């Protein structure tokens, strides 16, 4: 591993650790073909929230993310799968909110039994929609992986660059957590990939969980 990757980005000592963690998760997601939205990060990073060095590099990082996103959107059937994926997410949220409101209504305002059963029905629909949403999310990732397996040279260097950025950000997170006396257990990371140095896996992906839960290792940890 090169010295540059192991060297943390220069940031102020009291850096926003949550912003740093979320950025790691965002970029790692692109490497696993889960496309998050970089927009919420753009203004903060450009303004120097994560230091001048990363602010200067952000343009290249974002351009690399967009290369992957643009390629993925050209995959056959991708748009229809995304629409279904989004619809299921919206349905799950709507059923959850409706069911929760009915439970509150039954508990505090009325004892109508049919409202109780209706709330349970909505919550059941929400659970079913969430399960299908998770299944479809994985199906999307598989379809994208199959595409890149067939086109292994496509943006290979871009993906390697982004992986190096994630690795360096992980070392950066560990450096500033140690500098500020923070407990890694209180700042876990959610990652789709686990092939990074300097992390410890706490939980592996499950049926409804597609990410690893990890914590960074500090310098004095094995």
Residue ranges and their predicted role:
Residues 6, 10-35, 150-222:
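Charged, low-complexity cytosol-facing tails and large interhelical loops of integral membrane proteins
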Residues 45-89:
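Membrane-proximal, non-transmembrane alpha-helical segments
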Residues 31, 36-46:
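Conserved non-transmembrane functional hotspots
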Residues 80-157:
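Transmembrane alpha-helical hairpins and terminal membrane-anchor modules
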Residues 39-41, 53, 77, 185, ...:
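Generic low-complexity segments that are intrinsically disordered, proline-rich and/or Lys/Arg-biased
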